[in-house]
Amino acid sequence: MQNQRIRIRLKAFDHRLIDQSTAEIVETAKRTGAQVKGPIPLPTRKERFTVLTSPHVNKDARDQYEIRTHKRLIDIVEPTDKTVDALMRLDLAAGVDVQISLG
């Protein structure tokens, strides 16, 4: 797998879960002899919602909610076959979305 690159994008609502998952991926890749670039923190997406609390009138009474989506990027340069096998066997947290691309 010479001149290959594995790019891993992680998304999660909880920053602790995503940091724990990135640490596991980086540790696994380094243990198998691959060179790792990252984790690179990407911009956090903040979605805000405003909801009227009153069912009929009184527009001044509102609640505001926010969802934050945290993202990380990891590049694994020159992965070995052991690296790919170890990453496939890796069990990550349930709240983390993983996208893997080969380049």
Swiss-Prot record:
Per the UniProt entry, what is one GO biological process?
A: translation
Cystine pairs: none
Q: Per the record, a Pfam family?
A: Ribosomal_S10
GO molecular function terms attached to this record: structural constituent of ribosome; tRNA binding
Q: Specify the superkingdom.
A: Bacteria
Q: Name one GO cellular component term.
A: ribosome
**Which controlled-vocabulary keywords does the entry list?**
Ribonucleoprotein, Ribosomal protein
Quaternary structure per UniProt? Part of the 30S ribosomal subunit.
Q: What does this protein do?
A: Involved in the binding of tRNA to the ribosomes.
Q: What is this protein's record name?
A: Small ribosomal subunit protein uS10
Q: Which organism is it from?
A: Photobacterium profundum (strain SS9)
Which taxonomic lineage does the organism of this UniProt entry have? Bacteria, Pseudomonadati, Pseudomonadota, Gammaproteobacteria, Vibrionales
